Amino acid sequence: MISNPVKRYCLAKLFPVPRLFFFLTIFLLPWVLFAQFTYQIDQSIPVEVNGNLLAFPWAGGLNSAQLNTVDLNGDNKPDLAIYDRGAAKIFTFLNQNNKWQYRPEYEALFPAEVGQWMLLRDLNCDGKKDLFTSDPFGISVFINTTKPGENLSWRPYNPGFPLLTKGFSSNINLKVNESDIPAIDDIDGDGDLDILNLKFVGTGTIEYHKNLSMERTGRCDSMQLERVTQNFGGFEECSCGKFAFGKTCAQLGGGRTEHTGGKTLLTFDNDNDGDRDLLYSEESCAFVYLLENKGTKDLAVMLSSSVFPTSTPIAMSIFPAPYLEDVDFDGKADLLASPNVYARANLNNNNFQNSVWLYSNTGTTQSPKFSFSKNNFLQGEMIDVGDYSVPAFADYDADGDLDMFIGRYARQDFIGTVYQYENIGSPSAPAFKLITNDYANLSQLRSFNIKPQFADMDADGRVDLVLTSKNLKNGRASLSFLSNRTNQGMLFLLEFVTSIAFNVGGTENILINDINLDGLPDILLGTSDGAIEYWKNSGAADSINFTLQNKSYLGLGASTSRQNPALAIADLNADGNDDLIIGDQRGLITIYKNIRSNSPTLIASTDILYNPLLKTYATKSLGSKAQPVAINLFNTDKPAIIVGNSTGGLYVLKNEEGKELPPDPVVLIYPNPLPSADELSIKPDRNAQVQFFSILGQKVSEPTFIPANQIFKFAFPKLSRGIYIARFTINGKSSAQKFIIN
């Protein structure tokens, strides 16, 4: 905000008073509003797993990665641009001294139209890769227009129109099923790009669209396509792994051709004979098949198929898609594979923790030989619990800092667990170490889609572990909590699970929070239609009973862009008021300021993430199904936002304006004196532990952890009137405040 008197004076000199008011109202007010919520993606927090520090732990996870190399920063080195189909999001990694470094700021440089699939190929032979992607009417193409010293830029190849090809007699759209990935390569070896795609309808054959640019102009600067055959290679796919070579599926005895589901194609010269061989995969198959070209570059003939590579075949639950890019910096294209799926497919699910397979090229460029290297390329250097990560924080070891917990959707046996990371750093410089991938043995509950959070549900002054999950047997979602069985830290035992009578949809999200500040935990429910419902706890301190109070809390009713919103509440801008954070299906974060202001209109802040490359604030997808939690990780007056997502990773959004807290803590304790029938409210400005004593030093409670800037309420029905002491332990130092019960 404009608080410097010199700045105010300068503006007054430039504008007469009416114009100044207009300028401030129209132009500066939005900046003032949004500047209160300004964040950067932070990657500074170290994370240790099995004794090793992860290279980029906060990169967000990967599921269905489509891998391409491209020069992102103009240093003439190939970087990585990955489109994740499940997240509908691009991930960018820079090549820094032959090591990959996650750099999310480059993701904003790609066209917003990218969807379903993305292939980067040099269309016009200028040494810069151009972009091909899915279009509702076929294929969209964007030309790389980047100039030296400038950011990556693009222009549409044919603005407003998809890629065309000459059919039987005239130009038509080159149609590609949205689940398919075509092969875009120089099939005939003449120097320009041709396209292979599965026939859009009918038999399972491949169309060959030959580019006549070189033949007509002698230049490879355009896509002058003509469909020369609808049966490239002379074969049909009949079913998973079954092909009819030189005949139809009916002639083979395989019955009617099965063309449902997606297909992926990738061409390369596997045997160094000067023509293009084919890698083929399809949605219902676990393998990638090699079909060697026994013909020529001008007339392909496929006669057999085999799983590929021969030694250690690509084998995923469903729909592996292959890619060829040099990712180990030796100048030779390596083989990579990742499932080309949106998400899980019921119980037949891919292992999304290990879903990017790398086969290093130990041969040559001309005669490649692919040797299996790892099944978690990039994933092994980031937090990636598989899919649908849900973060939560609490001080489980009572050492004064916040430890991290991550709910995962399911293991390969379709049982969900919670990951536990101990904070081995400090309150202002966190560092996390993986302790277990099955905290509290929650796998024994035989549930999946576990979403953890911490709240005192039984009014004993200790945080309990609250779980939303689905039952493996019947698929129903439920709400329950594990009661904390220790006064020092946290101890959760499965025999102390309490089910809560509350109906929740399988994809809906619950936030436990004291909405009406009566000392009881209430519920905000993010529903499947995008509405946010407020359910008041109308029970007593030791008996929970939720009743619906508002079907459109804060006026947030049904919205197709906000389906299944995930929610968090915290004072984000240090103004003493709670704000609402919403993560939505698209992966976007929206903040509503001061939710208890009773304002008839609430302003949504969405352009909250700073891009240091573009020097702008913008809305940014953090992967679909964003799951936010606000927590003070850096010991500042403004908490960070940690976001989980569909790809199983995490992002840390650090508040740019957060100021380091002063050396002396500030703890609000009220009312003081305290009427004996009331509750004592405590709000510390940083993470604190509180314990109560009589004036004679007798202990009257066990220690309780209070997160920064959150109000905790304490009742003392059994204490007599008199003076008592609240002793606080903050960052290893103790302080005390007196209060009176009268």
What are these regions (language model features)?
Residues 1-4, 17, 664-670, 674-742:
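C-terminal outer-membrane/trafficking sorting elements
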Residues 1-40, 736:
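Bacterial Sec-dependent N-terminal signal peptides
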Residues 3-6, 12, 25, 422, ...:
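Generic cytosolic/nucleocytoplasmic N-terminal low-complexity/intrinsically disordered segments
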Residues 36-663, 673:
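Beta-propeller-forming repeat regions
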